[in-house]
Amino acid sequence: DSKPLNLVLPKEEPPNNPQTYGGGGGSRKDDFDVVLQGAQEV
């Protein structure tokens, strides 16, 4: 089932979808990490 993920995630790493790779968005990645940290703390 891991193969279909490759089709959904292009190798170009689109800047419009930073969450796709969990990064590549710069500031957005930091915000996303903060959300993850908050969830882990709870």
From Swiss-Prot:
Q: Indicate where this protein is primarily found.
A: secreted
Keyword flag Secreted: yes
Q: Which GO terms describe its cellular component?
A: extracellular region
Entry's localization field: Secreted
Q: Which UniProt keyword terms apply here? A: Antibiotic, Antimicrobial, Fungicide, Immunity, Innate immunity, Secreted
Specify the domain of life of the species encoding this protein: Eukaryota
Q: Outline the segment boundaries, as ranges, of region: Disordered.
A: 1-31
Single GO BP term? defense response to fungus
Please state, per the UniProt record, what induces or represses the expression of this protein. Answer: By bacterial infection.
Family stated for the protein in its record: Belongs to the attacin/sarcotoxin-2 family.
What more the UniProt record tells us is:
At least four isoforms with masses ranging from 8886.5 kDa to 9029.0 kDa seem to exist.
Function as written in the Swiss-Prot or TrEMBL entry: Antimicrobial peptide active against Gram-negative bacterium E.coli and fungus N.crassa. Has no activity against Gram-positive bacterium M.luteus. Active against E.coli and, weakly, against M.luteus.
- Kindly provide the name given to this protein in its UniProt entry: Diptericin
